[in-house]
């Protein structure tokens, strides 16, 4: 969603109708956002009244930017939810790793599909933009404080986020990057790179989609075309059939909804 710090055509009050328009156009059932502060998220939710949201801010009093999960209340029931911090003390609000640019969080929710009765757990995060060490440590905290337990219980799991990282060096990253690594190589790289780390636990929906990826490979725009780098991801467990994967490059009257283009996957839980 981008923090409310931009001016001109990119100020948040002008962007909210664009964001809502993209959401309504594509009819997302559930989605995660980053950098959303409460008063901005409240305005977005007012434009999308059938959506509900979970999550809290990253600051010590749980205010500030949040990784909210929005979901269609007519489609899903939220069974349980929470937020933890990507730090050495994940239950201490506002905590962070040394070297991190700011506190980082993960919001999670356990949901029941009201149509099928199937349940799943959804994690949504935003890794640090300054420190590569903090990004990797944050990914490991996310796994240790929920993701691995969900996998051990055999739950269907989704993970979304702005990871501020690529698998290959940024100038070399491409749709083929994941295919370059044998399992042992990926496992070794997982000790250095959060994208490799998550890819040893879950499927990158981009890589396993039954239909070719649509839209640009890159997802971050900084309000400029073409998008520059792929740092936004949707992961899922192996029991999830991925029908399609797309980077939504919509512009509304030539204007950007946000500084990242959203990434969407159409899936079926088997």
Residue ranges of model-derived segments:
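Catalytic metal-binding/acid-base residues of hydrolase active sites
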Residues: 37, 126-128, 163-166, 209-211
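Stable alpha-helical elements in mature extracytoplasmic
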Residues: 15, 19, 40, 44, ...
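Acidic/histidine-rich helix-loop elements
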Residues: 1-17, 86-101, 131, 180-183
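Metal-dependent phosphoester-hydrolase catalytic domains
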Residues: 133, 148-158, 165-270
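Alpha-helical scaffold elements lining the catalytic groove of polysaccharide deacetylases
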Residues: 10, 133-147, 224
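Active-site metal-binding loops of divalent metal-dependent hydrolases
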Residues: 1, 125-127, 162-163, 261
């Amino acid at each position: 969603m981008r923090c409310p710090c931009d001016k001109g055509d990119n100020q948040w009050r002008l962007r909210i109708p664009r964001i809502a328009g993209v959401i309504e156009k594509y009819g997302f059932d559930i989605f995660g956002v980053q950098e959303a502060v409460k008063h901005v998220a409240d305005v977005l939710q007012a434009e999308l009244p059938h959506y509900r949201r979970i999550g809290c801010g990253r600051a010590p009093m749980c205010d500030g930017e949040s990784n909210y999960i929005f979901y269609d209340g007519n489609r899903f029931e939220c069974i349980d939810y929470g937020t933890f911090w990507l730090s050495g003390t994940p239950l201490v609000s506002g905590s962070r790793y040394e070297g991190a640019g700011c506190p980082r969080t993960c919001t999670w929710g356990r949901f029941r599909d009201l149509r099928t009765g199937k349940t799943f757990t959804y994690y949504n995060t935003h890794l640090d933009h300054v420190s590569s060490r903090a990004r990797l440590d944050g990914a490991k905290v996310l796994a240790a404080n929920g993701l691995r337990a969900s996998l051990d219980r055999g739950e269907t799991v989704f993970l979304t986020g702005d990871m501020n990282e690529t698998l290959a060096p940024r100038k070399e990253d491409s749709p083929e990057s994941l295919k370059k690594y044998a399992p042992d190589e990926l496992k070794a790289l997982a000790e250095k790179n959060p994208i490799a780390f998550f890819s040893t636990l879950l499927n990158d929906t981009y890589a396993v989609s039954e239909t070719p990826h649509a839209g640009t490979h890159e997802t971050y725009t900084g309000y400029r075309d073409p998008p520059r780098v792929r740092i936004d991801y949707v992961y899922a467990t192996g029991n999830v059939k991925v029908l399609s994967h797309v980077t939504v490059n919509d512009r509304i009257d030539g204007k950007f909804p946000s500084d990242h283009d959203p990434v969407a996957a159409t899936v079926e839980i088997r």
